């Protein structure tokens, strides 16, 4: 069995066993363990939340005193009936949606595992990814509190350098990580902005 196949199988089965709808939860878990981006009682915005693995994990981290807003075009495959959770089924590009989410803030952390619909054409997919990242990044800068943290997915081969250089102007530290739970053949990496500057 190829290593990539084994890894995919391992994390998928682990997610099923632990009750998460997708293996992506272990990407955020590793980021959290290394960088502590989400703390108890934080206000957090989750962009591209479906099917809901990150949402479940974040709610466990926050406790009753925290608050989570989440948005996705698709519905969540989980049910969260808690007063400190708000889900908006909508478009993260839409200004009305952004205003609704901003009203629930400001946020101590913005996290995103969002990815555009893919075509199989790496150039097209990378460009779509960049457009999505720029939209999420602009939203994060609007809604984050000073000292806030930002996590997002980026595909290699795009405008990484420009985005990272701009982030250094707005965050005290910028880190890059390809989590172990990412598929072996995936071009994805995660960018972590720590401590938004005032």
Where are these regions (language model features)?
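Conserved class I S-adenosyl-L-methionine
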Residues: 40-50
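S-adenosyl-L-methionine
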Residues: 74-117
